[in-house]
């Protein structure tokens, strides 16, 4: 049976009002609890670049902002048997979704979504766990589009490939990059990265075999030489003209695959032998997206099934200490601090850090 928990009549949440202004809403509705989910009191949230873009055509007035959360279970749906009240969980939300406007991470209470959540490992803080969800989801989607398998959570060592296979990760000091490089290593691939020199050690700590200064004028040739002109895979975690151009130029003579985290400038995608695609975060739920073109997507059962498999794998890897979190900048101060953190992210004031805000 469902464990009874009475939510307050209202809660506080961060939203965008009818004037397209990010607003702290103190009389926001509380979500209802589906039978196959749990209700969570949010203790910490992490900020992502996508949070700062939910304005204009991407905004549903008074829908909740926020993707990444961690918190304490306060109620359990009738069909859930493996979670109890008091357990700690972390997960991702489909923020600013018109179908479920009261489900966003930046709120006092939320309900888990699909199977895109997991229990917080022993020894992890809420802040550490909250930093993972978007990175896990995006890293998994990127590997899928690159055509690379997810790690085997039961393996004691990474598989030995017949010959070294390099994967270029442009923007190797970003939060998504540090997770995907760890996953690539666990799948047997060799990540090489680009970033600023002051973040070289960060990228190497999280799996990069070697790191290159993204500002090097001869970088494409340097990477071609390093990979013996056989680079087949490039993941672009920055996505601008310079990053797309570099990735296409670095891929070897036989061609390969390029994946970015946002729509890439097509005029920079100059080689027919390179297949290009980009990730869209909400597809991890299988729900599709109602955002304007080119971000609109239909729902997909295959996407939903992949999201569940990814999170089953990633939860094990995190639990076993095979994936570690990005360096954090933890900010106290609740919802006002979220607004301040969003400004830090929007204006590009971070390097090698992920902003996490304490709510609890």
Swiss-Prot record:
Cross-referenced CDD domains: enoyl_reductase_like
Residues holding substrate: 134-141, 281-285
InterPro entries: ADH-like_C, ADH-like_N, GroES-like_sf, NAD(P)-bd_dom_sf, PKS_ER, Trans-enoyl_RdTase-like
Metabolic or biological pathway, per its Swiss-Prot or TrEMBL entry: Polyketide biosynthesis; lovastatin biosynthesis
Expression induction: Expression is controlled by the monacolin K cluster transcription regulator mokH.
A Pfam cross-reference name: ADH_zinc_N
Top EC class, one word: oxidoreductase
Protein residues bound to NADP(+): 50-53, 173-176, 196-199, 214, 261-262, 279, 350-351
Uses described in the biotechnology field: Monacoline K acts as an inhibitor of HMG-CoA reductase involved in cholesterogenesis. Its hypocholesterolemic activity might be useful for lowering cholesterol levels in the blood and reduce artherosclerosis and coronary heart disease.
The keyword Nucleotide-binding is annotated on this UniProt entry: yes
Coiled coil: none
GO molecular function: nucleotide binding; oxidoreductase activity, acting on NAD(P)H
The EC number(s) this enzyme carries: 1.-.-.-
UniProt entry keywords in alphabetical sequence: NADP, Nucleotide-binding, Oxidoreductase
Family named by the database record: Belongs to the zinc-containing alcohol dehydrogenase family.
Subunit structure: Monomer.
Function text: Dehydrogenase; part of the gene cluster that mediates the biosynthesis of monakolin K, also known as lovastatin, and which acts as a potent competitive inhibitor of HMG-CoA reductase. Monakolin K biosynthesis is performed in two stages. The first stage is catalyzed by the nonaketide synthase mokA, which belongs to type I polyketide synthases and catalyzes the iterative nine-step formation of the polyketide.
Protein name per UniProt: Dehydrogenase mokE
Source organism of the structure: Monascus pilosus (Red mold)
Taxonomic placement: Eukaryota, Fungi, Dikarya, Ascomycota, Pezizomycotina
């Amino acid at each position: 049976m469902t464990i009874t928990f009475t939510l307050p009549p209202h809660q506080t949440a961060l939203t965008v009002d009818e004037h397209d202004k990010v607003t702290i809403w103190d009389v926001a509705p509380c979500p209802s609890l589906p039978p196959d989910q749990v209700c969570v009191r949010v203790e910490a949230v992490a900020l992502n670049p996508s949070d700062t873009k939910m304005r204009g055509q991407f905004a549903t007035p008074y829908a909740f902002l926020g993707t990444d959360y961690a918190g304490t279970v306060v109620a359990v749906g009738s069909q859930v048997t493996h979670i109890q009240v008091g357990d700690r969980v972390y997960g991702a939300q489909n923020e600013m979704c018109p179908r479920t406007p009261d489900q966003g991470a930046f709120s006092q209470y939320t309900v888990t979504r699909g199977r895109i959540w997991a229990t917080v490992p022993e020894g992890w803080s809420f802040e550490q766990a909250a930093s993972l969800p978007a990175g896990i989801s995006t890293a998994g989607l990127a590997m899928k589009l690159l055509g690379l398998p997810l790690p085997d959570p039961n393996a004691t060592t990474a598989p030995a490939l017949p010959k070294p296979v390099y994967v270029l990760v442009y923007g190797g000091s970003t939060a998504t990059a540090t997770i995907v490089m760890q996953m690539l290593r666990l799948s047997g691939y060799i990540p090489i990265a680009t970033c600023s020199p002051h973040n070289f050690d960060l990228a190497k700590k999280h799996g990069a075999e070697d790191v290159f200064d993204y500002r090097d004028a001869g970088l494409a040739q340097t990477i071609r030489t390093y990979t013996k002109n056989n680079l087949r895979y490039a993941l672009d975690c920055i996505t601008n003209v310079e990053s797309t151009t570099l990735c296409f130029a670095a891929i070897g003579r036989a061609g390969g695959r390029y994946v970015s985290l946002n729509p890439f400038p097509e005029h920079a995608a100059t080689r027919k032998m390179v297949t290009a695609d980009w990730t869209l975060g909400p597809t991890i739920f299988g729900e599709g997206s109602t955002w304007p073109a080119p971000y609109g997507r239909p729902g997909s059962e295959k996407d939903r099934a992949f999201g569940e498999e990814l999170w089953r794998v990633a939860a094990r890897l995190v639990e076993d200490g095979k994936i570690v979190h990005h360096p954090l900048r933890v900010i106290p101060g609740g919802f006002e601090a979220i607004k301040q953190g969003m400004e830090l992210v929007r204006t590009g004031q971070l390097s090698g850090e992920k902003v996490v805000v304490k709510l609890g």
